[in-house]
Amino acid sequence: MIALIISLCSGAIVYAVSVMYAGIGETFSERAGIMNLGVEGVMLMGAVSGYITAVHTQNLFLSFLVVLLTGAALGLVFAFLTVTLQSDQTVCGMAMLIFGTGLSGFIGKDVSGVAANLKFEKIAIPVLSKIPVLGDIFFKQNLLTYAMYFIIPLSMFYIYRTRYGLKLRALGENPAALDAAGENVFAMRYGYIIFGCMMMSISGACVSLANTNFWNSGMTAGKGWIAFALV
């Protein structure tokens, strides 16, 4: 019975981490004053780009780099549409969702069902993993999960306890005041949108390269919408 509970709790953390990466990305984007409804589409693009790279290169580092570049590219496009062209955020977000969902399914069809034999394996932390119950749940996870243990408090500290975080909040709440203070509102929004999409892309990689070891169209299964709703 205890083993079952430990397994369920450990699995819940794995599931939650993929949602958290997307949620943090959306948080920074919305704090910057830009709502991104295309979270799910960006996640799928991150998932498929990372998996395709893993299949063809068998290099996890290179796969992760491609995931980051995919997120950055999508973020740049979204920032251009919403910040430079000042297009409707809802329409652009839905367009990103449809684009990401469709393109990921198209480019991923050749690797659907193909095993990459490469993923972020679970790593037991010495000493901490020996703690009864908690060690099995929290300290026998993959690198992306361990990174999230630090990203959450660091993000909170950045947003609420630093000068840059104050500017970020002003960027969303009163951009005119920030502009009057001599800050480049456009450049800051570009940066945070790109960063947000990179986090969303990592979220997709969590699904295809950590939680599982395969690619299937639509495999994020609504996690992007859950992240958006939580934010």
Predicted regions located by residue number:
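Helix-loop-helix "hairpin" substructures at the membrane interface of multi-pass membrane proteins
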Residues: 138-214
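Short alpha-helical transmembrane interface motifs in multi-pass membrane proteins
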Residues: 6-11, 59-64, 196, 213, ...
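Interfacial loop-to-helix junctions that mark the boundaries of transmembrane helices
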Residues: 2-10, 61, 86, 134-145
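Non-cytoplasmic
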Residues: 27, 31, 35, 198-218, ...
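Residue-level signature of the transmembrane alpha-helical core
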Residues: 12, 16, 20, 64, ...
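Pore- or pathway-lining transmembrane helices of multi-pass membrane proteins that form conduits
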Residues: 80, 84-109, 118-121, 148, ...
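Single transmembrane alpha-helix segments in multi-pass membrane proteins
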Residues: 7-56, 64, 68-69, 73-90
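Transmembrane helix-bundle core of multi-pass membrane transporters
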Residues: 100-161, 191
